[in-house]
Amino acid sequence: MSAKKSYLKVWRGLAGAAGSCARVFSKKSLARRDRRDQLPFALFLFGLVGAVFQWFLYGNWLSGIVSEYTVAAFFGGFSIVLPILLIGFSIWLFRNPQKTHDNIRVSIGLFMFSSFSAAFLHFSAGFPYPSSGIRILSTAGGIIGWLVGLPLTTLPSYLAKTVCIIFIVLSVSVISKTPISKIVRVIFRYAKWLFNSDSVKTSPNSSVSSSSEHQELTGRDMPDTAGDNRHDETVTVLSGTSLTGSPVSEYHGESSDYALPSLDILNSYPPAKHDDAENEKVITALSGVLRQFSVNARFSGFSRGPTVTQYELELGEGVKVERIIALTKNISYAVASDKVSILSPIPGKSAIGIEIPNKKRELVALGSVLQSIHPDAHPMTVGLGKDSSGGFVLTNLTTMPHLLVAGATGSGKSSFVNSMITSILLRAHPSQVRLVLIDPKRVELAIYSGVPHLITPIVTDPKKASEVLQWVVKEMERRYDDLASFGFRHIDDFNLAVRAKKIASDSRELTPYPYLLVIVDELADLMLVAAKDVEESIVRITQLARASGIHIVLATQRPSVNVVTGLIKANVPSRLAFAVSSLVDSRVILDRPGAEKLVGQGDGLFLPISAGKPIRIQSSWVTENEILRVVEYVKSQAHPDYYVLEVQNQGNIDSHIGDDMPLLLKATELVINSQLGSTSMLQRKLRVGFAKAGRLMDLMESMGIVGPGQGSKAREVLVTPQDLDSTLARISASVSDSKLD
């Protein structure tokens, strides 16, 4: 008995020494009670013995016999690789004994990799049966290769091998916890480098995404039916923003070969390095709280996200969930954080989630999020960021169908809006998606001025914004008139029929309608100026516009009941809350607490239309330099095709122009070319008095050429020099029409 104990002691000592050697370069320290060195030491010895027989004694008759009747009998020719896998897996177990779920995952992945590799070799050797003898089996795929490949024998050999390769790639994804899309991109990249061929490439912004980590939260992608790639060669300025103007049809910019930007235009960042020692310290602190209050529960694992880590707590028998919730303040004290959130239960698990902010936050770059979107995905699909387990969060704006965003200063609301617009510019053609940007702050969205996706210059005047929203309502009604006339229920079906030339109109040429995305950066400013008109237009849009391809995103810093009214909330089903200052604000935006405990800088709670509970995300981040590069690129591809704003009383003013027509045309040319809406400039250049110059400026404002007066400041010019000729022609035509009337 003493000899047996001595052998066990020696075995444990050798296992401990091997484990210490394996952990010598590890950054984290491992307590002695947490070490599990005996199993990995046994695997290490098997791998070492296998390496000696398979590599160093290769060709020896004794080694051949031993190999044929052991590992080669099971795995065939793949047995020469097994020592590497066994030694590598043993080192992993030495260094990560407590990661139970990860260890099971890696074990399953390694077995899949070995089995399907053996099956591939078995098919390559002609798929011999066991009756052929052990010698032939050991040179093919062995017993394992035969068993795994047996269900595939009904397929042709090349298809069976393809299935094996697919499962091998899947096993690599399971082992490395790497999305399949990234593995495919690496394979393509090395294939292109190896063969130096242009035929092995992906599209400029391509990335094949099929990983289970990439969570498509809002349903399937819609087909790409909004817009076409056909353009006219000239820029056409249509008077589509008056409440009686023509409907929005597809883009007519001047570039017929518009190319989407490559995702390489965005910055690339190295992957974040996680320090598991920090998480182990938190688990130790949390376990101490449970022991202190005699709570029968244990931590089964954790999921580290970019901002917070979610620790999974499994309760013992007879322990109420309320006991854990009652310990929230004690947990906050133990981990020195006042931003602790408790999720009970974790969706799909019999466990409670305790979310604690990380000391070192991970940067979620927009480029990495967009890489996870399939290149054939819907053009309105945007990358929101990452969830609390590190998976990418994507959403299709058409399925939301409208979004309400709120957050205090510094919470990351404006960064999210920038990421969303940049996603659209990177993934959508101007013929597919048109934008209406309303920016009462005047500076938040000014960087996007002149992009070809804009349907009108960026609206900064709250009064003008009310008129724009009224125009959107009219545009929605026009689209519904077309849908009703031709018997369609959704704009996608109408566009498909137009492209297939299945429908036609006697009065006009039918063209596909693009999606129309309206973004209001600060709803509170609009509600202060024209609350009744703005609320009425927003409610009409949110109630009816989904089937017409019109969607709206409302952002505000003050989610009070005066800004986010009951009617607006009732018709905007999807919400995104960033950090707010009070529980009341959180209830206004989410109808529940939680947003007041967010840590800011992009930390948010996303509540899509299909979710019962909000999902914690870290919003994607895009720098100003990246936005500038994207904007400059899309502006170099095409010019904007504006629908110039016109007010309702334009006809009354035009009819009284009289002999001032030549002066008006000269004034228009001066203002557009100089991009300076100054009354004193008109006085000097045209040599007219103050009253005449002021009247000319009022006429130009009524025609949508300049914005409203801003005191002593120059007026904003709403028309670019590229649109000068068409604007002058429009003025002349409108005056001629008013005279004929």
From Swiss-Prot:
One of its GO terms (molecular function) is ATP binding. The keyword RNA-binding does not apply. GO terms for biological process: cell division; chromosome segregation. InterPro entries: AAA+_ATPase, FtsK/SpoIIIE/SftA, FtsK_alpha, FtsK_dom, Ftsk_gamma, P-loop_NTPase, WH-like_DNA-bd_sf, WH_DNA-bd_sf. Residues 200-232 are annotated as: Disordered. Residues 200-212 have a biased composition (Low complexity). Keywords: ATP-binding, Cell cycle, Cell division, Cell membrane, Chromosome partition, DNA-binding, Membrane, Nucleotide-binding, Transmembrane, Transmembrane helix. It is a multi-pass membrane protein. The chain crosses the membrane at residues 39-59, 74-94, 108-128, 136-156, 163-183. Residues 184-741 are cytoplasmic. ATP binds at residues 410-415. CDD domains: TrwB_TraG_TraD_VirD4 (cd01127). One of its GO terms (cellular component) is plasma membrane. Residues 390-587 form the FtsK domain. It comes from the Bacteria. Residues 213-232 have a biased composition (Basic and acidic residues). It is found in: Cell membrane. Homohexamer. Forms a ring that surrounds DNA. Essential cell division protein that coordinates cell division and chromosome segregation. The N-terminus is involved in assembly of the cell-division machinery. The C-terminus functions as a DNA motor that moves dsDNA in an ATP-dependent manner towards the dif recombination site, which is located within the replication terminus region. Required for activation of the Xer recombinase, allowing activation of chromosome unlinking by recombination. Belongs to the FtsK/SpoIIIE/SftA family. Consists of an N-terminal domain, which is sufficient for the localization to the septal ring and is required for cell division, followed by a linker domain, and a C-terminal domain, which forms the translocation motor involved in chromosome segregation. The C-terminal domain can be further subdivided into alpha, beta and gamma subdomains. The alpha and beta subdomains form the DNA pump, and the gamma subdomain is a regulatory subdomain. This is DNA translocase FtsK. It comes from Tropheryma whipplei (strain Twist). The gene is ftsK.
